[in-house]
Amino acid sequence: MRVDLFDFDLPEERIALRPASPRDSARMLVVRPGKPLEDCIVRDLPQFLRPGDALVFNDTKVIPARLSGIRRRGETVAQIEATLHMRAGPDRWKAFLKPAKRVAVGERIQFGHDGESCFLGSLDATVAEKGEGGEALLVFDFSGPVLDEAIAAAGHVPLPPYIASKRPDDERDRADYQTIYAREEGAVAAPTAGLHFTPDLFSALDTIGVERHFVTLHVGAGTFLPVKAEDTEAHRMHAEWGEVDGMTADALNAVRARGGCIIAVGTTSLRLLESAAEPSGLLKAWSGETDIFITPGYRFRAIDILMTNFHLPRSTLFMLVSAFSGLETMKSAYSHAIDQGYRFYSYGDSSLLFREDT
């Protein structure tokens, strides 16, 4: 399909720079294909679910993956920013460098140069490989838990480019850009649909008998990469590591067997479950890298309802929601959201999407 079919105009003022407070006070647009749109708020979610339904959350935890460093070449010093996006070993990470052209393979970058990164000293890495789009493989002097500690001390919250270009990260972001149930460290971007959940909302869902299950997909910085191809067939999707354990797969299969709905909280949960689903829709234990790319025409196997934020024009995620609820339905929904002042992107409002064929 032509990528320009997924384009739309978004006024700059619709981009949220801070989240709603409290989290579950964010607005939520309910989209049922063929039915009128409903303007709600996130804490209304329980009224759209039934006893025995199951919410699936991504429990990945965001690490402070944006590192500022310097590259020395004789008397010349260049400022380099690295955004870690996938761990490649105990002492190495794949990262996007900016500006990548100022660093050659074999050169070293010193991070945390304005102070010690951990009790052992500063955080240094060697550029072992360079790839496309500014990607590089960094091999650090530290390894394992010591490297993790150094990154935590030297790193910044990896806010998305559309926020970071307007303001610096601060201490508030360390809490705001993390779900309340995050536990598996490794993401460099938040699974943002989950940011709306609060203990009170969990209690309300428990009261009506909605199940909660957790999977892990470490969201990479590639989620923000633009689609440069003119046709979706030519786009190369980034890979992310995820896992669905056997107990979770069995529990979700049981939900389906008794007629319950499976609700993915976020596109990361959806992409992971679709990767783990057999053609019949049966879920199995699964782990590994997924580069699943969902566009209109895809037949969903594992998910009935999707809760997700509002996405960028021409993005793979807007393509995904268009596949889920229909392209024309989503264009109409986004037009309504823009007209009604909904807040977009990672810190923005939410939508509750019903599948086109349900």
Curated annotation (Swiss-Prot):
Disulfide bonds: none
EC number: 2.4.99.17
Keywords associated with the record: Cytoplasm, Queuosine biosynthesis, S-adenosyl-L-methionine, Transferase
GO biological process, one term: queuosine biosynthetic process
Family matches, as Gene3D superfamilies: QueA-like (3.40.1780.10)
Catalysis: reaction(s): 7-aminomethyl-7-carbaguanosine(34) in tRNA + S-adenosyl-L-methionine = epoxyqueuosine(34) in tRNA + adenine + L-methionine + 2 H(+)
Pathway: tRNA modification; tRNA-queuosine biosynthesis
Superkingdom of source: Bacteria
GO cellular component: cytoplasm
Name of the top EC class for this enzyme: transferase
Subcellular location: Cytoplasm
One Gene Ontology molecular-function label: S-adenosylmethionine:tRNA ribosyltransferase-isomerase activity
InterPro entries for the chain: QueA, QueA_dom1, QueA_dom2, QueA_sf
HAMAP family linked to this entry: QueA
Subunit structure: Monomer.
Matching NCBIfam families: PRK00147.1, queA
Purpose of the protein: Transfers and isomerizes the ribose moiety from AdoMet to the 7-aminomethyl group of 7-deazaguanine (preQ1-tRNA) to give epoxyqueuosine (oQ-tRNA).
Family: Belongs to the QueA family.
Name of the featured protein: S-adenosylmethionine:tRNA ribosyltransferase-isomerase
Organism ancestry: Bacteria, Pseudomonadati, Pseudomonadota, Alphaproteobacteria, Hyphomicrobiales
